[in-house]
Amino acid sequence: RPDVSGKKVELEFDVCPRGRLRCPRRVVAEMKDRWGPLGAECDSVPGYVHDPVGDLAARAGAGVLQKYHGRALLITTGACAVNCRYCFRRHFPYAEESAAANQWQQAIGYLAGDTSITELLLSGGDPLSLSTSKLRSLSDQLKPLTHIKRLRFHTRLPIVLPERVDAEFTDWLSSLPYQLVFVVHANHANELDGPVTSALRALGRAGATVLNQSVLLKGVNDSSEDLAALSERLFDAGVLPYYLHLLDKVQGAAHFEVPVD
């Protein structure tokens, strides 16, 4: 029961052996159901599976997933700043599919062999959990691949660990020859405090288009008031509210489902 800012946070660590927890101190006391393990994660619910979005069938090897023409996704790492309890990749075999683990070469080789790929998504895990020097190593190796026009980062770190968006990182972004897109992940207006807003605006100043994706979660943001407040706060931070996803039916997350009539 961590004591954070004078608040006792009750977490069910001993209920489910699969209930790993990782969460920065600044957010551990906020909306605990999204961060802390719950016994409901061990419930077996029909229709909830390990791979709800078909990632395994899309594996091209070396951490590359390709589902669509002209676009590839790179599993840069399995690491995240938080373990979101509803993550659709919570059962993904990161030990087998992480491009950073082989120093990028195999993934670069695959991307070089398909000149139809114009957009590269950096995902994971969270690409910003890698150091800027590691990301710079990747961008250096991508330079000869002139068919790649856009880099798209899917990241939660600017929301939960805004200090990651530092001067070294934004200087590197500004130096890149790509159209840059950041898809950040905030679900509730309370996540967008002053430091987070500053980090999001810094991404925009570095030349990135910044979008937000949210997941509709029972007990977290399942009201029109919550969603409207989130959109307003995102606009104030220079971020376009872009996606609102229904819950992906991943095993262990059924308690977050919002019924759609």
Predicted regions and their residues:
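Generic hydrophobic, aliphatic-rich segments that mediate packing or membrane embedding
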Residues: 14, 27, 72, 80-83, ...
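N-terminal pre-triad scaffold of radical SAM enzymes
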Residues: 57-87
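Conserved AdoMet/S-adenosylmethionine-binding subsite of the radical SAM
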Residues: 105-119, 128-259
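Iron-sulfur (Fe-S) cluster-binding segments and ferredoxin-like electron-carrier domains
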Residues: 87-99
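Conserved catalytic-core segments centered on acid/base and nucleophilic motifs
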Residues: 74-75, 87, 119-122, 127-128
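Flexible, acidic/Gly-rich N-terminal and inter-domain linker regions that tether
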Residues: 1-66
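Short, intrinsically disordered, charge-balanced linker/junction segments flanking boundaries
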Residues: 13, 259-261
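Surface-exposed cleft-lining segments at the edges of enzyme active sites
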Residues: 94-96, 124-125, 153
